[in-house]
């Protein structure tokens, strides 16, 4: 059993699974490399806003007063984003729709909104990807992505009740989505990771750009790809000490690295370890094994316990009544295999 003291750092990952209709999922880690799902892998919050009622790409930011603010993609083709807040990541406020692109009747979408709190100005930046036909420098597209040419837009707020006018945030010479910002604690500048979304020829890779101050914007001259010859998206940058980790979705392979199975685009963020401990300890919201597990049998091999059973839940296996395997080192924290 790990003893954790107040003031120590732990890490949370907000994410969605499958089609995102079941809502917000959380995972935790103490080192940024080994992650376990909370709440037995079940959702903490079911989406209730937007025409499709999705909760894709949940981005969470903790305010100086301890409140957690979250924004998310509510639809594939909507001009709003979802918003809710919480003091404990378990009980959430009424969900709201922020009409960030309602003033643009031709806007196709509002994808992957992200939150960043700028300490010097005590201001929250919310930024996302939108296509507005004819608005941006044209790029060649594949037939399947015809008409999609994204740029990053943003609004600011101090209270999540009033918002600035929507403005352009990042306008490179390529279609761009999935922007995510993290502060470098050593250099004290800001790093933004973005996806080059060009489809003809396909790029589908992650690039980096840096700035000293967010209000001055980010250079549109970006780095060479930091990912390999596979399609990547959904970057989630996180500093663990002086080391920068960038988690991302190898979406054609249907996997993230070093995180729970089935995870999709979200945000990694640091919290006081006591917050993670309270989430783990709350058995009302974190059962050892999710509901609907039948005929359990446990065996131990080496230092690992394996629990075998059948389930009616869909873990991406495609059918009910499928045999499943969970494993644990301590008989308390179980991960799905």
Short names for language-model regions:
Residues 1-337:
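Carbohydrate-active catalytic/glycan-binding domains of CAZyme proteins
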């Amino acid at each position: 059993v790990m003893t954790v003291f107040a003031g120590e750092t732990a890490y949370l990952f907000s994410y969605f699974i499958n089609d995102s209709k079941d809502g917000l999922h959380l995972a935790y880690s103490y080192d940024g490399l080994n992650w376990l799902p909370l709440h037995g892998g079940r959702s903490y919050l079911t989406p209730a806003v937007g025409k499709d009622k999705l909760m894709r790409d949940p981005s969470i930011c903790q305010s100086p007063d301890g409140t957690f603010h979250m924004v998310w993609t509510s639809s594939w083709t909507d001009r709003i984003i979802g918003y809710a807040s919480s003091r404990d990541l378990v009980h959430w406020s009424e969900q709201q729709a922020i009409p960030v692109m309602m003033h643009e009747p031709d806007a196709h979408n509002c994808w992957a909104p992200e939150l960043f709190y700028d300490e010097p100005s005590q201001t929250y930046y919310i930024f996302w990807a939108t296509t507005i036909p004819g608005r941006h420098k044209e790029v060649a597209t594949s037939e399947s992505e015809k008409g999609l040419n994204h740029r990053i837009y943003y609004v600011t707020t101090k209270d999540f009740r009033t918002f600035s006018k929507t403005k352009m945030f990042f306008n490179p010479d390529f279609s761009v989505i999935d922007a995510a910002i993290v502060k470098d604690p050593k250099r004290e500048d800001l790093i933004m990771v973005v996806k080059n979304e060009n489809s003809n020829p396909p790029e589908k890779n992650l690039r980096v750009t840096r700035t000293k101050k967010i209000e001055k914007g980010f250079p549109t001259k970006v780095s060479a790809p930091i990912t390999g010859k596979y399609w990547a998206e959904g970057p989630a940058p996180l500093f663990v000490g002086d080391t920068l980790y960038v988690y991302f979705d190898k979406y054609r392979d249907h996997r993230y690295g070093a995180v729970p199975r089935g995870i999709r685009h979200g945000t990694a963020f640091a919290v006081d370890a006591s917050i993670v401990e309270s989430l783990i300890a709350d058995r009302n919201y974190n059962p050892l094994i999710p509901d609907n597990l039948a005929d359990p049998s446990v065996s131990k091999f080496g230092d690992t316990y394996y629990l075998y059973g059948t389930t009616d839940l869909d873990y991406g296996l495609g059918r009910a009544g499928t045999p499943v395997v969970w494993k644990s080192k301590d008989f308390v924290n179980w991960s799905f295999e």
